[in-house]
A protein has these predicted regions:
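Multi-pass alpha-helical membrane architecture of UbiA-family
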Residues: 2-330
Length: 330
């Protein structure tokens, strides 16, 4: 009897140790997931923050005076936009380790130290949470979120790798940015905000489309700047980017065309969407700032670190342009 009791106690001891080991293992996995999530929040918020701002500005364009009533929806769709952008960056880094090892060594080391499965879990969680929030706000917002997720997967997945195809890399990036801007307007409409149906499509107000297009076209400045900064790694990886395909001068011409396209759109849509004179002045001033910035950076293309550090300036200018357009369209 004592022997049987001893064996039973030993089994219980082994089971207890196994349970403790399992709990410790789960705790370690959770800490690892949390650490990499915090790392990406810290390092990827700078390129991502402009997405929720554009989303909220688009929401504000539709809701106007109802914004105080719509604060929860505006906040929610802004969070969804941020999560969508963050998840896309995490997934892109996951599929881009080799190139990042050349262009961004610190980032590559952090990514390589994480298990592929762990990073995929984070991506699925972020995409899933963003889609859920969008669905709660409106079904139309949910559909745009799903389209964005599909586009993000096609952009980075090795089977499709749209980021390696010129000029699809920039076109897809710009389209994704436009979708996140449009997400705000669609969420406001789905949340019950009214808008004037005059000069609008049956689905979206023209002003929202105008705002989204203006936000997206800025990525024909921002993306080539990233290409200039990462030209060494892209050349080794065999990627076709603006400076590698068009050359430096033609790439700069593409970048300079953006403010002139926005000015042309402003003239064409002045009466159609009732653009205000104050907004027009703000748009012109912002376009002049953009031209001046491109002219300044064109003389410093031999310094990749400087170019990389100035990419945030383009984001500031893009947000400034969105605010100028909001003033013009309200």
């Amino acid at each position: 009897m004592e022997t049987k009791s001893g064996i039973g106690d030993e089994k219980l001891f082994v089971e207890d140790n196994s349970s403790i080991h399992m709990v410790k293992s789960l705790h370690q996995q959770f800490r690892s997931q949390l650490q990499i999530f915090i790392y990406y929040v810290k390092t990827r918020t700078p390129p991502v923050y402009c997405y929720p701002i554009a989303t909220i500005l688009s929401f504000l364009l539709i809701s106007k005076t109802q914004i105080l009533e719509d604060v929860p929806a505006a906040f929610g769709i802004g969070i969804a936009s941020y999560l969508l952008g963050l998840a896309t960056y995490v997934y892109n880094d996951l599929t881009d380790i080799d190139v990042d090892h050349i262009n961004r060594k610190e980032q590559s080391i952090v990514t390589q130290n994480q298990s592929r499965r762990g990073l995929i879990i984070i991506v699925i969680f972020l995409f899933g949470l963003a889609a859920t929030i969008s669905y709660i706000i409106s079904f139309s917002a949910f559909l745009i979120s799903i389209i964005f997720i599909i586009l993000g997967i096609f952009y980075s997945h090795p089977k499709f790798s749209l980021k390696s195809k010129f000029p699809l890399k920039t076109i897809v990036t710009a389209t994704g940015a436009g979708l996140l801007s449009l997400l705000g307007g669609v969420a406001a409409i789905g949340n019950g905000s009214d808008y004037d149906t005059l000069h609008n499509t049956t689905i979206f107000p023209l002003s929202t489309i105008y705002l989204a297009f203006s936000f997206s076209i800025f990525y024909f400045i921002q993306s080539p700047m990233g290409d200039f900064a990462d030209i060494k790694g892209d050349r080794i990886a065999g990627r076709n980017t603006f400076p590698l395909v068009l050359g430096i001068n033609r790439t700069l011409a593409v970048m300079l065309s953006v403010p002139f396209i926005i000015l042309t759109m402003n003239g064409m849509c002045y009466n159609l969407v009732h653009i205000s004179i104050h907004g027009t002045v703000a748009i012109v001033i912002t376009c002049l700032l953009v031209v001046g910035f491109i002219g300044w950076i064109s003389n410093r293309l031999d310094d990749p670190l400087l170019i990389k550090s100035k990419r945030n300036n383009v984001r500031y200018l893009n947000i400034l342009m969105q605010m100028a357009l909001l003033i013009a369209l309200l």
